Amino acid sequence: MLVAGFLLALPPSWAAGAPRAGRRPARPRGCADRPEELLEQLYGRLAAGVLSAFHHTLQLGPREQARNASCPAGGRPADRRFRPPTNLRSVSPWAYRISYDPARYPRYLPEAYCLCRGCLTGLFGEEDVRFRSAPVYMPTVVLRRTPACAGGRSVYTEAYVTIPVGCTCVPEPEKDADSINSSIDKQGAKLLLGPNDAPAGP
């Protein structure tokens, strides 16, 4: 229904130029792209303004994007007046990188990625690998450029994608937990037995 409504909202020449599935979205020679203002209007209608605000607020500056982020395990700011952003204070900290696709609108989208393999659940913020930092995904709508050309302009259609927006802490699968417990039990048994001790026979 959403696709049909979107195509009905377009000029007749756009709807008639909708591409067939399976064709590569290469821009035909002599076909210009749509004006940025028009793409923003169409995207705003689909996203109802919410995702547009999300897109603009999460865009990173050049310095932040170039920063080499790493897992802040056990790290505490020397200056207590400095309060890191929420994504770095989480037990599953994450950072953002910018995804660029010239055939998509918005062409730039922020994507979250986890900084740690485990979770910072230790007493002093140490990383605990019994838990795992996992990305959290959110569905969103974008405009995708198609191979069709109408009136000398490229035709766009709506497409639904999922993007990572943050990270959360989840327990490791039971198989891994059992393996860790088994390893701990074996080490404990070695400590209890002396070098000349051997398990009693049946």
Swiss-Prot record:
Keywords, sorted A to Z: Cytokine, Glycoprotein, Secreted, Signal
Biological process terms in GO annotation: inflammatory response; negative regulation of hemopoiesis; positive regulation of cytokine production involved in inflammatory response; positive regulation of granulocyte macrophage colony-stimulating factor production; positive regulation of interleukin-6 production; positive regulation of interleukin-8 production
Gene3D superfamilies in the record: Cystine-knot cytokines (2.10.90.10)
The organism's place on the tree of life at top rank: Eukaryota
Subcellular localization: Secreted
InterPro entries: Cystine-knot_cytokine, IL-17_chr, IL-17_fam
Molecular function via GO: cytokine activity; protein homodimerization activity; receptor ligand activity
Intrachain disulfide bonds: none
Transmembrane segments: none
Cellular compartments per GO CC: extracellular space
Signal sequence annotation: 1-15
Glycosylation sites recorded in the entry for this protein: N68, N181
Tissue note: Expressed preferentially in adipose, skeletal muscle and CNS.
UniProt-annotated stretches for the region Disordered: 65-85
Main location: secreted
Similarity comment: Belongs to the IL-17 family.
Functional note: Induces expression of IL6, CXCL8/IL8, and CSF2/GM-CSF from endothelial cells.
Protein name according to UniProt: Interleukin-17D
